């Protein structure tokens, strides 16, 4: 076995330990198709592969329900008011109910985290309070936190401070096309201060809220621009992190800017005395006068004024300078938009439902804002998982920061700012030696795997948008988990946004051809089923159900090794759609090899040719099982049982081994296969439809 597993040149190197995380769904809802198809299937497939590749004991796959935050509070309030949930239900019971439904849905999709926790529930919640305290104190002791008085929305009608999604307006970031801007972030992940939100409305009263000053803890993220740029340069040069992720991060590493429309500068009330907008002939003079006045009023800055662009860009050295310029514009009733840059990252809030912030400098009764605490929640879940394994929870550091370990975090592209910037700077700062410069070392930090949007019928669908996504569990009334897993992986979310277009959601008169959701699954339910059945029926008929142990044809062996290495490379790069291409090519090659030779063997009565064919094809089935196991585990287990293979067939130490090395029965005996047997099943609704046709 050892000599079989020699590494060819250029083969990817995997860590000895791996933590895989998947983005946490909110505790106010069930899982919709985007949660499962856009993230969880990818994370689970990679986790299953890593268990096979480096050993299950060396892999921890965690995720959980995001229990806190304004979306959960709002969901709870609305459902109680509308009578969807009982009036006496507590918010704790509310998130626990949704957590259990989420967990059941993941199980139904054969998604198997080692620990699926909840930030407010069970033992994981206890670890989460501890992790939150540890990180806060580490950052505070290293001088990375500051108490800031910042504006917050207040609804005078309801007499409450408004958080997160209790306020909706337009994102102030130049060029942003998000549907909704919330209190201090938009639904595309842009960060800004509440006072920057354009046309805010309270979700409680529907009226424009007031702004009052409140105190909160902030992490000094704005000080890490240079360190983040150095980190990005190293990640770009030394890792396989997706380039668009790095490009997205770099967009935020720019100096603070504001954009002001030229037509607004021209009517600067400090310089313009006319009525209405200046006409074309007078515009240039009015614009130049207004610009000169602003230039004198602003702190030191650079001006970018391109002739063909309708706005002027003012570039500042610091956020303070930018905000002084914004104040000067506000004094003149001139609107502006801001650009992407690093801003202080809020850690605390004032809603009661949250993880408590340690009392510090006399500030008490604060809770952590949901976004930062959800970044370290996977650490809390790792602690809980280790504890369940009988290990010391303090070993989490070996898994998250050990030299032989790697953390892989599967997220959606809208959350790159939080995971790719705020998390990296916070984790590095908390681990730094007090009083020393912070080095954001990519070798001690997670690798971010951000998928693009999964659309529904070519449109972006989410629980908070006009187009509502189908619930994940509802899809299982029409498709099997394995069919959906194959299809979701094939969508190519590593490179582009792709649309999920199940025909069952189309009117019957609009349905044409084969349902696209079934295309990849047909490789299993048609082609692979056929080759496995054919081989088993043939050994039953001619070989007393015993697999012949000959020498595998060189072409089949070479094709198998090529498929293994190509698959491994794509899995290393998290290019899941390319994995489906490898599987399609390889399994169809096996099927063609069998079909082209079995007839010849039977016509010529060639026992030797038939045995050679069976030797080749069973070796191919062994290889296909290794590659399919992370994607379609149940069907693979059924094949393994009937072919008579041990669990070594899934172990990458045996990837290039001979057939005899992975047999459950040394003599190669297979299990009797009844007629018309399927290993990979179609959904019963599909069978009924086939019978009708």
Named regions from a protein language model:
Residues 2-56, 60-63, 67, 130, ...:
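Structured secondary-structure scaffolds
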Residues 35, 462-463, 468-693:
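Structural preference for alpha-helix termini/caps and helix-kink/transition segments
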Residues 75-96:
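A charged helix-plus-loop insertion that forms the helical arch/lid used to bind
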Residues 94-106, 419:
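Structured alpha-helical segments in the cores of large, soluble enzyme domains
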Residues 101-182, 225, 229-237, 252:
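A broadly conserved sequence feature marking short terminus-proximal activation segments
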Residues 162, 178-181, 192-193, 208-211:
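Cys/His-rich microdomains that often coordinate metals
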């Amino acid at each position: 076995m050892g000599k079989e597993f020699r590494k060819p040149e250029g083969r990817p190197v995997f860590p000895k330990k791996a933590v895989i995380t998947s983005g946490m769904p909110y505790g106010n809802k069930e899982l919709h198709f985007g949660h499962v198809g856009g993230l969880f299937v990818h994370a689970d497939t990679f986790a299953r592969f890593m268990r096979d590749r480096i050993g299950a004991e060396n892999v921890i796959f965690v995720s959980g329900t995001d229990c806190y935050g304004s979306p959960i509070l709002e969901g709870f309030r609305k459902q109680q008011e509308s009578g969807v949930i009982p009036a006496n239900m507590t918010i704790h019971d509310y998130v626990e109910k949704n957590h259990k439904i989420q967990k059941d849905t993941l199980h139904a999709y054969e998604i198997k985290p080692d620990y699926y926790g909840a930030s407010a529930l069970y033992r994981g919640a206890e670890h989460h309070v501890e992790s939150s305290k540890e990180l806060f104190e580490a950052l505070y002791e290293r001088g990375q936190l500051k108490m800031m008085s910042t504006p917050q929305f207040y609804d005078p009608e309801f007499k409450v401070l408004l958080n997160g999604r209790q306020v909706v307006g337009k994102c102030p970031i130049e060029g942003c096309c998000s549907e909704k801007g919330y209190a201090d972030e938009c639904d595309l992940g842009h960060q800004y201060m509440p006072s920057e939100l354009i046309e805010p409305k309270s979700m409680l009263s529907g009226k424009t809220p007031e702004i009052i000053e409140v105190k909160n803890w902030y992490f000094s993220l704005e000080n890490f621009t240079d360190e983040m740029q150095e980190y990005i340069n190293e990640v770009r040069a030394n890792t396989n992190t997706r380039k668009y992720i790095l490009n997205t991060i770099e967009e935020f590493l720019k100096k603070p800017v504001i954009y002001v429309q030229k037509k607004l500068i021209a009517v600067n009330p400090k310089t313009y005395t006319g009525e209405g907008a200046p006409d074309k002939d007078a515009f240039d003079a009015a614009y130049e006068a207004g610009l000169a006045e602003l230039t004198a009023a602003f702190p030191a800055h650079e001006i970018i004024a391109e002739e063909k662009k309708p706005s002027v860009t003012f570039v500042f050295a610091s956020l303070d300078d930018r905000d002084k310029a914004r104040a000067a514009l506000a004094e003149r009733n001139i609107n502006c938009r801001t650009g992407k840059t690093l801003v202080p990252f809020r850690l605390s809030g004032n809603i009661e439902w949250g993880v408590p912030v340690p009392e510090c400098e006399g500030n008490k009764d604060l809770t952590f804002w949901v976004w930062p605490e959800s970044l370290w929640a996977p650490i809390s879940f790792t602690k809980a998982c280790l504890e369940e394994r009988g290990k010391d929870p303090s070993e989490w550091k070996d898994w998250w920061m050990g030299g032989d370990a790697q953390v892989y975090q599967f997220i959606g592209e809208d959350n790159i700012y939080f995971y790719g910037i705020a998390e990296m700077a916070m984790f590095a700062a908390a681990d730094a030696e007090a009083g020393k410069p912070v080095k954001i070392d990519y070798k001690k930090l997670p690798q971010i795997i951000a998928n693009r949007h999964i659309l529904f019928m070519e449109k972006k669908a989410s629980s908070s948008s006009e187009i509502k996504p189908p619930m994940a569990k509802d899809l299982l009334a029409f498709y099997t988990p394995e069919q959906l897993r194959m299809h979701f992986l094939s969508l190519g979310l590593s490179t582009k946004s792709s649309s999920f277009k199940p025909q069952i959601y189309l009117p019957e008169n609009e349905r044409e051809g084969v349902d696209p959701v079934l295309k990849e699954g047909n490789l299993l339910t048609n082609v692979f089923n056929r080759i496995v059945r054919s081989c088993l029926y043939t050994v039953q008929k001619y070989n007393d159900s015993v697999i012949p142990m000959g020498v595998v044809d060189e072409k089949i062996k070479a094709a198998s090794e090529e498929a293994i290495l190509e698959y491994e490379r794509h899995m290393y790069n998290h290019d899941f759609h390319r994995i489906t291409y490898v599987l399609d090519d390889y399994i169809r090659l096996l099927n063609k090899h069998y079909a082209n030779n079995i007839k010849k063997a039977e016509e010529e009565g060639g026992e030797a040719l038939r045995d050679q064919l069976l030797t080749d094809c069973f070796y191919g089935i062994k290889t296909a099982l290794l590659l399919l196991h992370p994607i379609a585990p149940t069907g693979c287990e059924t094949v393994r049982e009937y072919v008579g293979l041990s669990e070594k067939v899934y172990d990458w130490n045996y990837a290039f081994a001979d057939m005899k090395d992975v047999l459950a029965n040394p003599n190669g005996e297979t299990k009797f296969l009844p007629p018309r047997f399927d290993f990979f099943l179609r959904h019963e609704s599909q069978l009924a439809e086939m019978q009708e046709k």
